[in-house]
Amino acid sequence: MKPIALKLGGYQEPASIHNRAASRFGELLTRKFGDRISFELIGNVLKIGRPSGDLAAMVENGEIDFCYLSTVRFAKWVPELKLLELPFVVKDRKALSAAFTGGFGDLIRRRMRESTPYRLLGLWDNGFRHFTNKVRPIRTPADCQGLRIRSQMSELHAEVFRAFGFEPIPVDVKQFIEEIASGRFDAQENPLTNTYNFGVHNYHRYITLSGHLFGAAAFICREERYQSWPQDVRAAVDSSASEATTYQHHLAMVEDAEILSKLDPSKNEVIHLTDAERAAFVKASQPVLDRHRKELDPKLFAYLEA
């Protein structure tokens, strides 16, 4: 019998926590089914000329079966995901992990089924996002004035950065990586794992641990494709995705300290904000938070405090 071919696409390097979790997912399925399935991880579609933004469409049209992708890409269909785009709302990472695997994850799973062709298999921890730049240490919003910053494909993020004083330029990660060395961007913001694994630290001396936003990635497949698999394969996909998600959350929890230990102090200056300095960024972005908070069900914020 011909094996069930399963392909998972991502946009990062092999050492990234996302691709390590994706590999774990494939290992679990292969261990259970052996030759009954074939599993292929296309860990970085950027290397085959595709932007990360193509991943969801690749799942929808059947080029691949699974992918992980920033939840920013799904917020227009699932407005509840905007909760994760708001500045400084995530304070307790463990509480958020519990929400991802609990009530909030269940809510997003339902909303994605209702509004998209996708099935949510897990919400992955993309980490606290921090500023890096090549110009000067950033300690206050005044230090951000006039700096061109690459942002994700999110107008809400752009609003936050404008509130800080940046000039945001939204581009896909593929274009960002290709241009980071060109000097187009003075600054960028990413979780430390991306800053390091994408090599940004080689071009940006200054790393400010701002934690201004928290990122999440949706691990998805196409609902129609999922329903085409035999019941035992569907069950194994669910259980393997759950285990891979738990593993991914664990990796994310310890990754920041590991990345900081790898940075060379002679090449990178890590700026730890004082409480007062952080408060200045919170104050600057408060109007953005207040404006968008009105658009969301107040009950959503309870997930961040559970």
Where are these regions (language model features)?
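Hinge/lid segment of periplasmic solute-binding proteins
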Residues: 99-115
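N-terminal secretory/targeting leader peptides
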Residues: 1-95, 113-114, 118-306
